Amino acid sequence: MITNWDSVAWAFNDFSIDSVIYIQEATLDDWEKVITFLNENDSLVFEVYNYEDFDPCKTTNQIDREFIFQSFSNHSETDDNAKAHFSLNGLEINCFFEFKDQIELCFQAGSVKSIDDYKKVEELMIKLSTLLNRMVTLAYEGGVVFPLIKVDVTRGIIEVVDEKKYENRFYSLKYRILSLQSKFLEIFFPEKNRIMWVKIHEDDYLPKKIKDNAW
């Protein structure tokens, strides 16, 4: 259990970005357990919304397993989508069912303002790690490979990355090479440079293997 707010406050000081609790390499069995767990929350609201205008076309207080599992096996861009929203002692959390192999619980980073708020997040991560018997991480949206916090109850791990280490991630050899490549393309092929960064940004939001994580 992290008890020093100063050691984690830096990770929650931005209202413009979402923090995400990630469960990587998830299985349908993991989803089944998480859906059952979330359905036990009295504040849960499950919405199915129209893909064209994002207006809710179905709202209930329980996640529809059949709809979610069907969407995993046969989903197109023109199908309706779904999300679940619940309150965790005042912390507002959303779950979007985008990927079969990665579970994501999102909340506004800046809503965690104290050690008490942080404990709510950590306790949720501990419950999920215990429930699934696997590692659970927290990272910024689109940054799953750079965890801020790791929790693995089985291995006795509750760790927060050092702020300086996190900031230095862009000084790795991989990113230095990418930076040089980008500078070259920007001078001679600016459109290719733009396309490259669009693809990188899109790829950041796709599921990642645990082995791809920076630590």
Predicted regions and their residues:
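Short, intrinsically disordered low-complexity segments
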Residues: V45-F107
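Short Gly/Ser/Thr- and Asp/Glu-enriched loop/turn motifs at secondary-structure junctions
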Residues: S16, K100, G142-V144
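Long, contiguous N-terminal structural blocks used for assembly/anchoring
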Residues: M1-E66, Q70-S71, W215
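Short linear motifs in intrinsically disordered
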Residues: A11, R65-S76, M125-T130, E186
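Solvent-exposed loop and beta-edge segments used for protein-protein assembly and interaction
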Residues: N13-F15, F99, T130
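Catalytic micro-motifs at enzyme active sites that drive phosphoryl/nucleotidyl and oxygen chemistry
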Residues: S7-W10, L91-N94, M125
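Short, hydrophobic/proline-enriched secondary-structure or compact coil segments at domain edges
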Residues: I17-E25, D101-S111
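Acidic, proline/glycine-rich low-complexity IDRs
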Residues: M1-T3, F107-W215
